[in-house]
Amino acid sequence: MSLLTEVETYVLSIVPSGPLKAEIAQRLEDVFAGKNTDLEALMEWLKTRPILSPLTKGILGFVFTLTVPSERGLQRRRFVQNALNGNGDPNNMDRAVKLYRKLKREITFHGAKEIALSYSAGALASCMGLIYNRMGAVTTEVAFGLVCATCEQIADSQHRSHRQMVATTNPLIRHENRMVLASTTAKAMEQMAGSSEQAAEAMEIASQARQMVQAMRAIGTHPSSSAGLKDDLLENLQTYQKRMGVQVQRFK
């Protein structure tokens, strides 16, 4: 796996799924391929994206700034600086300075990542802030190691939170989660079916499923009524899998 592929993988792991994730992936690919060289326009686009947390925007802004060649005097962006200040916690800043001193002696991506993984996400973000604000300089490889370690820390906590939700025994949360998954699956299938002339029936099934979820939410239903909802939807859509040329199993 190449260095840039690894960076793209880690960064995308902290971006919520949806159309915006596909857009960000495309921009990262363009930046890494040297196709997008307008850093100012890129940062303005990033600043106005909805859904993304300030920290995710800060990390993406840091990656774009590292990768896109720019004039030395180009202004640093406030939204990135604010995201990478470690929540203003002096402890984070102290740890970030210690980490920076270690990274300064490191030259490899993997070496930097290993060192950084023993620090908290707050300290890692503060260290990125030091480098972004030109208070410290490290090689691009080392900076990317720092980025990937930060993303790994964030993705780990997101995964723990997701696992807790999936494992919950609370019937109301399970019920709502099944309806959200069914609705999301239907929406994705509608988008994919849109490019196929023969997928009108699949579109209809997906649309009916979404209407059913809306109705269940509107009238309030028993927590067990959503059991199997997503699986039923997938079974129906399976019929049109060959016509649509889509691997529906991936949604399971």
Curated annotation (Swiss-Prot):
Location(s) in or outside the cell: Virion membrane; Host nucleus
Region (Membrane-binding): 1-164
Record's bilayer topology term: Peripheral membrane protein
Protein name per UniProt: Matrix protein 1
Any Pfam family matching the protein: Flu_M1_C
Keywords: Host nucleus, Membrane, RNA-binding, Viral matrix protein, Virion
Provenance organism: Influenza A virus (strain A/Memphis/8/1988 H3N2)
UniProt xrefs under SUPFAM superfamilies: Influenza virus matrix protein M1 (SSF48145)
Anything else known: Most abundant protein in virion. When expressed alone can form virus-like particles in transfected cells.
CC terms in the record's Gene Ontology section: host cell nucleus; membrane; virion membrane
